[in-house]
Amino acid sequence: MEYLGNTELLNVPKTAFLASSTIQPDMVLKCYDWATQMAKERQCVVSGFSSHLESEVLHFLAKGKQPIILVLAREMYKQIPAELQPLLDDNRLLIISVSKAVRQSKATARSRNKYICEMADKILFVGVTEKSSLYQLKEEFKEKSIKYE
């Protein structure tokens, strides 16, 4: 495991955001509202930010002031994406790499998502059905699961 950024974020309460790759359109705006609310409340959000919706939520969170933990299912960035550099500079981002793989795979994503669930105090699962790769985690960590209406 490799860390870059503010490791003190490991000690604060964290809410995980995990979204299926297939989302109903009505859920998208709700997730944007949720991200805006988390930013206003300065709640730490942890995610892989790899699905389309997760990456969109990261854009909303990046505009706020709350801490963010980004967990990669691949090796650490060789070059930090431009959007993330100001967050590192402001000491409100922690990037964690949980794999030495060059690219994310289904296996490394599963491992990353489980790690996120284990570290989070609460988890918002979005668009998860029985066919979703996140379904097993949603069942395993249902005591941490929250809803956003």
What are these regions (language model features)?
Residues 1-149:
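Glycine-biased, small-residue-rich flexible motifs in mid-sequence functional cores and linkers
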